[in-house]
């Protein structure tokens, strides 16, 4: 049996690197749409889905969905503390940890990943920036070491516990959304997702570039 655990930061602090491109309310709607894409990608595979957050609004938003909310207490500091706190509420042996900002994740990705799972194994999917965008583990196998270059930290943690981690590179899972350029990946590869449709609603588009300056430019059209 597999469960999924999705940690979500307080909405007033999400995606600050997009603050010059999206308003605070737009950034909140962006994270909600990305979260729905992640939910749709993992829900066909997982027996239960847990979301851990300090934010009442995000947990309230998820009430119509088959999600088990876990409200963090005020004394929890950081992502690893939040995950360890959430583990106390999870009954399933195998846990898929995934962030809320990888909206290109697909059911097929999760299917292929869980097929690799063995007893007491750890599966790691790296992000483009050195982080860990998805991890499958038994809660007793290793400690989570998110923040910074967590992909390398998790490999080190596995070695310290005599576990040979299974590395599962995935283009779609590797794309997390933090910058304006990241939005372009959704506009190119994410047709049909909640996130894609939301960006289009905001009149945001990706314009191809034919130079060494980059593959594309993300623009927002003024409709006034």
Curated annotation (Swiss-Prot):
EC number of the protein: 2.7.7.68
Enzyme class: transferase
SUPFAM superfamilies reported for this sequence: Nucleotide-diphospho-sugar transferases
Catalytic activity of the protein: (2S)-2-phospholactate + GTP + H(+) = (2S)-lactyl-2-diphospho-5'-guanosine + diphosphate
Top-level taxonomic group: Archaea
A UniProt-annotated Pfam family: CofC
Entry keywords, A to Z: GTP-binding, Nucleotide-binding, Nucleotidyltransferase, Transferase
GO BP, sorted A to Z: F420-0 metabolic process
Quaternary data: Homodimer.
Function per UniProt: Guanylyltransferase that catalyzes the activation of (2S)-2-phospholactate (2-PL) as (2S)-lactyl-2-diphospho-5'-guanosine, via the condensation of 2-PL with GTP. It is involved in the biosynthesis of coenzyme F420, a hydride carrier cofactor.
Name this protein carries in UniProt: 2-phospho-L-lactate guanylyltransferase
Organism: Methanococcus aeolicus (strain ATCC BAA-1280 / DSM 17508 / OCM 812 / Nankai-3)
Taxonomic placement: Archaea, Methanobacteriati, Methanobacteriota, Methanomada group, Methanococci
């Amino acid at each position: 049996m597999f469960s999924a655990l999705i940690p979500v930061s307080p909405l007033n602090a999400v995606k600050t690197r997009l603050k010059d491109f999206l308003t605070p309310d737009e950034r909140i709607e962006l994270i909600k749409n990305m979260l729905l894409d992640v939910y749709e990608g993992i829900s066909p595979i997982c027996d239960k889905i847990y979301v851990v957050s300090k934010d009442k609004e995000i947990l309230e938003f998820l009430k119509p969905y088959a999600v088990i909310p876990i409200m963090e207490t005020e004394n929890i500091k950081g992502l690893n503390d939040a995950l360890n706190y959430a583990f106390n509420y999870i009954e399933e042996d195998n846990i898929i940890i995934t962030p809320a900002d990888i909206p290109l994740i697909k059911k097929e990705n999760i299917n292929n990943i869980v097929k690799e799972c063995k007893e007491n194994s750890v599966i790691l999917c790296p992000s483009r920036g050195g982080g860990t965008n998805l991890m499958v583990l038994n809660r007793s196998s290793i400690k989570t070491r998110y923040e910074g270059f967590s992909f390398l930290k998790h490999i080190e943690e596995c070695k310290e516990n005599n576990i040979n981690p299974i590395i599962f590179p995935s283009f779609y899972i590797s794309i997390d959304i933090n910058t304006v350029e990241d939005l372009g990946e959704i506009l190119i590869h994410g047709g049909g997702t909640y996130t894609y449709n939301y960006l289009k609603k905001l009149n945001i588009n990706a314009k191809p570039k034919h130079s060494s300056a980059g593959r594309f430019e993300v623009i927002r059209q003024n409709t006034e």
